[in-house]
Every structure is written in structure tokens, then in C-alpha cells.
Amino acid sequence: MYEDLITEIPDFPIKGVNFKDISPLLADEQAFRSAIVEMGGLYYNDVGVPDYWVGIDSRGFIFASALAIYFGGGVILARKEGKTPGDIVSVSYDLEYGSATLEMQKVGMGGGEVVIVDDVLATGGTLKATNELAEKAGYAVAGNLVLIDLKYVPRVDNFNLDVRSVVSYV
């Protein structure tokens, strides 16, 4: 069902990358609602409602917010460097060609369980860094949740996270 609403854009954002565009799925109210219910259900039966859903910049924000509204819990944003005001905690990590930094605001930090949410899992570098960021901020990571898992993409070194997904491409 969801695969019909996920289009592939060849050579975007760079040559050799086939981008999975979720815009048609997000525009379809019934499919989007169904995806949120299915995503949340992957954890709800095991851990219940986390204290927070951590959305990864930027499309993870969409899913984390919708999950929080539907299932309960708050939303915390894991943002790209320089996008977060105030008192922050940060983690830097390596990309295939360079490095990046994620930041999280310290507002409301005091522990609790989080589920980390993103739209797509490819190499796992950003998801792994977000786990480190959440733990550095004092949260217990209950799990990782993505809409799409690109299982055919090689993972970063030492990637051993439990990730649950609604759609997988092998």
C-alpha cells in the first residue's frame, strides 16, 4: 500500500542516489494516518508510550509530531548544527564525505524514555548519532523507528541498533 505512494527520484540529490520521495504518502490523509498508526504500533505493544518522540531533522519532525499527537508523549527535535537556540547538547559524527553535528535543546531534559524517529534509514550514521545525542542528554533510548528502511545500503561501522520500519527495500 505505502510503496505505491513512495516515488523514486533518480540521481537526487546527487548522481547515483535514488531518492525515496514520501511527499505523495504525506499528501494522502488516509495513507499518512495509517502509516502513523502502524509505526506507533511497532513500539506501543512493547514499551507503551515513550516520554518523548525524538524527531530527526527534518522529516523525522513530521513523524515524531504525528506520533505524539496520536499516541501521546512529547516531541524533542534533533537538529542540524546551528539551528537550535539556547542551551544545547551536541554530537558530531562522520559522513561518507565529511562530518556533521546534531544538536538538541536542553529544555525539558531530565531523563525519561525516548523513541527516535526518522523517515528513512540508509547508512545509519545519523540515527546512530541521534542515539548518542539522546543518551548524552540523559534519556534512555527505548527504540528507533523509521518509515522506510533501505536494507540494501551498507550500514556505518558498529551499527547495532534495533530499528523497526513499516516499509523495507532490499
What are these regions, as identified by a protein language model?
Residues 1-49, 105:
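Active-site-facing substrate-recognition patch
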Residues 4-5, 128-170:
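PRPP-dependent phosphoribosyltransferase catalytic core
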Residues 48-57:
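Short glycine-rich phosphate-binding loop at a beta-alpha junction
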Residues 51, 112, 142:
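Conserved acidic residues
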Residues 55, 116-117:
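Generic enzyme active-site microenvironment
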Residues 62-71, 131:
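Short Gly/Thr/Asp-enriched flexible loops that form oxyanion-binding sites at enzyme active sites
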Residues 73-115:
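Short, glycine/charge-rich flexible loops or terminal/linker lids adjacent to PRPP-binding catalytic cores
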Residues 119, 124:
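Conserved G/P- and acidic residue-centered "switch" motifs that form tight phosphate/ATP-binding loops
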